[in-house]
From Swiss-Prot:
It comes from the Bacteria. Belongs to the bacterial solute-binding protein 8 family. It comes from Bacillus subtilis (strain 168). This is Uncharacterized ABC transporter substrate-binding lipoprotein YvrC. Residues 1-20 form the signal peptide. A lipid is attached at residue 21 (N-palmitoyl cysteine). InterPro entries: ABC_Transporter_SBP, ABC_transptr_periplasmic_BD, Vit_B12_bind_prot. Residues 59-311 form the Fe/B12 periplasmic-binding domain. GO terms for biological process: cellular response to iron ion. Probably part of an ABC transporter complex. Keywords: Cell membrane, Lipoprotein, Membrane, Palmitate, Signal. The complex is composed of two ATP-binding proteins (YvrA), two transmembrane proteins (YvrB) and a solute-binding protein (YvrC). The gene is yvrC. It holds the Pfam family Peripla_BP_2.
Length: 314
């Protein structure tokens, strides 16, 4: 009996080991099957359309830099076959086919034979005809939301993740961004009310100067670092005159339009502004603070280090 029991134990152990090793080909097929089972997916996009993506996209065209950055951050960059001429990040996009700027080259997009086109809510009106032509050509178009807050940026990431079969990576990215943002908020808590600075954000240069008011992610970025938006009484993206800006008299000025600090300080009438008097005019990387994508937290850090160097610069 003991001998027979020993034989059965040996056979059982061998079976377990074989099951554990498995066939590599079978394991690969199993993983592919699991991914296939995710699709089709139906997503309620920013155009209020239920967009069904029947299978995992192999070719993706992005019509907005923020969409592109998200797609690459989710590990889907090898599937991107078309981007706009406005795309600058990551560096790999330089070699990707260009499909126009805000005006979509429909023929070019169709020639790339994409499984999925990532459009954007902010350009819905301008590209309405182009989007219709793409849909008429049988191409799946998903319109990503125009994010104006961190929570909406997270939604954009999750939407693209679901569309591309990268939901897990999207969840990980969102968690990482939230964690990094929390770290910044903790540092900002050390800034007292008396130390808080009013900040004017210039997103478009003179003669047509635009700034950011409330209900924008840039306003939220300032709130996170305990800075006061000098134009907080405005809503959205608004144009302001030189006289109005001088009257606001901000403690700091941040340009996101490529204009250098010295050029701002030389503007007529601006010498009376506190920010200019005390040389607190900063130019930051526009792509970090104006693109509603995965690098937005880096933008918050750059703003914080510029406005409160003693608190945030290590």
């Amino acid at each position: 009996m003991k001998k027979r029991a020993g034989i059965w134990a040996a056979l059982l152990l061998a079976a377990v080991m074989l099951a554990g090793c498995g066939n590599p080909a079978d394991q690969k097929d199993s993983k592919a099957k699991q991914k296939t089972e995710v699709f089709p997916v139906t997503i309620d996009d920013a155009s209020n359309q239920d967009v069904t993506i029947k299978k995992e996209p192999k070719k993706i065209v992005s019509l907005m830099p923020s969409n592109t950055e998200i797609t690459y951050a989710l590990g889907l960059g090898d599937k991107v076959v078309g981007v706009t001429t406005n795309d600058t990040y990551p560096k790999e996009v330089k070699k990707v086919e260009k499909v126009g700027d805000m005006n979509v080259n429909v023929e070019k997009v169709i020639s790339l034979k994409p499984d999925l086109v990532l459009a954007h809510e902010s350009s819905m009106s301008a590209s309405a005809d182009a989007i219709k032509q793409l849909k008429d050509a049988g191409i799946t178009v998903l319109t990503v939301n125009d994010a104006q807050s961190f929570s909406e940026v997270y939604k954009s990431i999750e939407m693209i993740g679901e569309a591309g079969g990268a939901e897990k990576k999207a969840d990980q990215l969102v968690k990482s961004m939230k964690s990094d943002l929390k770290d910044i908020q903790e540092k900002a808590k050390t800034i007292s009310k008396d130390e808080e600075k009013s900040v004017f954000i210039e997103v478009s240069p003179d003669p047509d100067i635009y700034t950011t008011g409330k209900d924008t992610f840039m306003n939220e970025m300032l709130n996170v670092i305990h800075a006061k938006n000098a134009a907080a009484d405005q809503t959205g993206w608004v144009q302001m005159t030189d006289e109005a800006i001088v009257k606001l008299n901000p403690d700091a000025i941040v340009t996101t339009d490529g204009v250098k600090a010295k050029a701002v300080e030389k503007r007529d009438g601006w010498s009376e502004i506190n920010a200019v008097k005390h040389h607190r005019v900063y130019d930051v990387d526009p792509d970090l603070v104006t693109r509603s994508g995965p690098r937005l937290i880096e933008g918050v850090e750059e703003l914080a280090e510029s406005i409160y160097p003693d608190t945030f610069k290590e």
